[in-house]
Amino acid sequence: MRWWPALPLLLLAVAVAGAGDAAPVCTRPSAAEAIVGSPEACRSPLRRPLGVTEGDDAILARAVNLLHANKEDFAAVLFYASWCPFSQECRLRFEKLACIFPTIRHLAIEESTVRLRTRYRYGIHGYPTLFLINSTVRVRYHGPRTVKSLAAFYNDVSGINPSMDPAVGDDNIEPKRDCEQEKCLFWSARTPENILQPDTYLTLAASFVILRLLYLFYPKITAFVKRTWSRRTLFTCLEQGKHKFNRVYPSKQGNLHDGARHATAWASKSLASVSIGEPSTS
């Protein structure tokens, strides 16, 4: 009967183990797992849709890696700009789509948080730009940015049916019809300084190329500058010599001008006298 004092402790250990098996503890998902989900994540039937998740370049890369692990999952990625009115309008519709398609993870990325090489990889030349991606495909949306059209695009690419009628999604969204273009172009809205600012490696590469070109063309540039400077110096010296000569010998120059004027007057008088004397001799 020596094991009777240890019986309560044994029963407590069995109860704790049974409770652990019945109700496992859900760990907090990371930012990338919150976008596309994870096989190890707890999938409760009462779990609400996550809506739109704001991300950056690093979160996008991790989300793509998780999509390769979950081959049946889809994610919608919207690249937008806060200064673009079309992006603001599309951002509201993107939130509507997150409610219409709760099984598709929605990631919104603002243009200031994405490096330039990511823009080149996805071919982003204007805002807003929408992609549907999974482990095998990456489809860009081209068409009218209405909730109904976007929902049809989701259905065609992913095969997922909407959870509600997409026709009611545009009721409280006022379209921007005061502009002629349909997209805010990236290159026309940013200066070269702002383009080089987000990516340090691009700045260093551009600086190296510029310095390399200067090194290659430096002899030619130097020779051209020397020739131009020598010609300019020679012309300046000639002009200065001419002015000095005029200051040193002003009388001779004046006498030459006076002599030329007198010679012209004498020639005109001689011609006049000859023309007058001809009738008297006849």
UniProtKB/Swiss-Prot annotation:
<keyword id="KW-0325">Glycoprotein</keyword>
<feature type="glycosylation site" description="N-linked (GlcNAc...) asparagine">
    <location>
        <position position="134"/>
    </location>
</feature>
<keyword id="KW-1133">Transmembrane helix</keyword>
<keyword id="KW-0413">Isomerase</keyword>
<dbReference type="Pfam" id="PF00085">
    <property type="entry name" value="Thioredoxin"/>
</dbReference>
<dbReference type="InterPro" id="IPR013766">
    <property type="entry name" value="Thioredoxin_domain"/>
</dbReference>
<dbReference type="InterPro" id="IPR036249">
    <property type="entry name" value="Thioredoxin-like_sf"/>
</dbReference>
<dbReference type="GO" id="GO:0016020">
    <property type="term" value="C:membrane"/>
</dbReference>
<keyword id="KW-0732">Signal</keyword>
<keyword id="KW-0472">Membrane</keyword>
<dbReference type="GO" id="GO:0016853">
    <property type="term" value="F:isomerase activity"/>
</dbReference>
<protein>
    <recommendedName>
        <fullName>5'-adenylylsulfate reductase-like 2</fullName>
    </recommendedName>
</protein>
<feature type="signal peptide">
    <location>
        <begin position="1"/>
        <end position="19"/>
    </location>
</feature>
<feature type="domain" description="Thioredoxin">
    <location>
        <begin position="20"/>
        <end position="159"/>
    </location>
</feature>
<dbReference type="InterPro" id="IPR044606">
    <property type="entry name" value="APRL4/6"/>
</dbReference>
<feature type="transmembrane region" description="Helical">
    <location>
        <begin position="205"/>
        <end position="225"/>
    </location>
</feature>
<keyword id="KW-0812">Transmembrane</keyword>
